[in-house]
Regions:
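Catalytic phosphate-donor-binding core of small-molecule kinases
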Residues: 1-54, 60-152
């Protein structure tokens, strides 16, 4: 996940996640508004979406928070889900080559990702780019990981 200030070309933050990146409302009493693009195509006809949580998940992470929101898992691509949105939008699974872009149109918000205590405060105008990492992850286990699609 890469975060840019409004209008900036140089990122103010870059982070990596194995499971998911999520944007959550920054204040308990204020939902967040944003616009989203899948590559350069506006999502949901470019409407401004009001939400409590917006998540982009990997297949590995789809069994966790993504599943809690959507009641589904996936084995390839990236999953985009919304929790407590006022819009009639569906969760979507996109090819792993797609870049998910979002811009906060009303904040504040918080960016968090799995297994870390760190988070990043976001404000109105901040832009996010979420994509599959070019660096593969190494998972150490006692036994082999598998799934029905052998995607892990």
């Amino acid at each position: 996940c890469t975060v840019f200030d409004d209008g900036a070309h140089k990122p103010k933050y870059t982070g990596a996640s194995m499971n998911e990146c999520k944007v959550h409302m920054g204040h308990i009493n204020l939902a967040v508004r944003f616009k989203i693009w899948l590559d350069d195509e506006p999502f949901a006809n470019g409407i401004e979406i009001l939400f409590v949580v917006f998540i982009v998940s990997t297949p590995f992470g789809s069994t966790a928070y993504f599943n809690q929101i959507t009641r589904g898992v996936f084995y390839t691509g990236l999953g985009v889900a919304f929790k407590n949105t006022t819009e009639l939008t569906s969760h979507v699974i996109v090819p792993e080559s797609v870049v998910v872009r979002a811009q906060i149109t009303r904040g504040p918000a918080v960016l968090a990702y799995d297994n870390t205590e760190k988070y990043l405060d976001l404000r109105q105008g901040d832009r996010l780019e979420l994509r599959k990492s070019e660096i593969p992850a190494t998972v150490l286990t006692w036994s082999r990981l598998s799934n029905p699609a052998n995607g892990f």
